[in-house]
Amino acid sequence: MNLDIPLGSKSNYIEQNSLLRWIKYRTLSTLHYIDFQLRKDENELRMAFDTKNPFENSPDWQELEKIPAAGQIDRGLLTMHNGLRVLPTAYYGYGHGKLMQRSLGIHEPQEERLFHDILACIPANSTMMELGSYWAYYSLWFHKAVPQARNIMVEPRLSNLNYGQEHFRLNGFTGEFVLAGIGKDVKQDGELRIAGIDELMHELSVEKLAILHSDIQGYELEMLQSADKAIKDRAIDFFFISTHSDDIHQDCKSHLIESGYHILDDYRIAESWTPDGLIVAQSPELDRINLKPAVKKI
């Protein structure tokens, strides 16, 4: 049972039909539970049935403030640590949903603590672009924290893009959603558009991005190469780049340093509490902030 339907699938009409999506979202936890029982994936079984919070020993998890309702499900929605409400299993299914209940609505403790601290530096009327936005969690957080925020979500999978749209609706927010993949070579790959950062910023009339957040599964360096003009013009204040191999991590870090950006913090996959590494970088046009580093997992 595949609930996350790729673009071009014969079943894609579900994602294009508002009534069918409404039915899907209201039965999603049940559907994901059936999928979980049928697949019996070992990693998801561990996430679902473990009784411990996997992040309880992370100092960054401990530092993040959690509202009293964090991790609880109320009227079919999961409350995250900061009060945002999401579909409980939209982020990678039943196992992750159970994990986020135990972790009190935190799914990436190091990155979330860094993101929280950077948000304190973002002025009103700022714009964020999230690449590989999926459930749009970081965009939701930005929109909640920054007055008069503008949010742009870019995601290549229609079902994932729709999760983000539903989460914005559930939280009473509005945003701009773009169905596209990211690459340095602008093209049409079958039914999927491949776009670059410079192209998207021009197309969407974005003069400045306060945050560009990227989680695009191995295309990180291509993303930076597609932002050549924006980087030269210092049109991006902060980068949050999830990295998916040590080689890509080092290539991206070197590219940013060579472009004059300051690396505020970074950690590799082996140092992370989750499967991704991270690079946080700041434009040299800004006064360099004193960002407390994430605590690396030993």
Q: Model-predicted segments: where are they?
A:
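Hydrophobic packing residues within well-ordered alpha-helices of enzyme cores
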Residues: 115, 142, 164, 168, ...
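Cofactor-binding loops of NAD(P)H-dependent oxidoreductases
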Residues: 93, 180, 214
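Short, glycine/acidic-enriched loop or turn micro-motifs at the edges of active sites
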Residues: 133-135, 158, 184, 216-218, ...
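S-adenosyl-L-methionine
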Residues: 1-154, 157-206, 263, ...
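Phosphate/oxyanion-binding active-site loops and adjacent basic polyanion-contact surfaces
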Residues: 104-111, 189, 193, 216, ...
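Conserved acidic-Pro-Pro-aromatic motif
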Residues: 149-153, 199-298
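Well-ordered alpha-helical segments embedded in enzymatic catalytic cores
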Residues: 110, 114-117, 196-199, 223-226
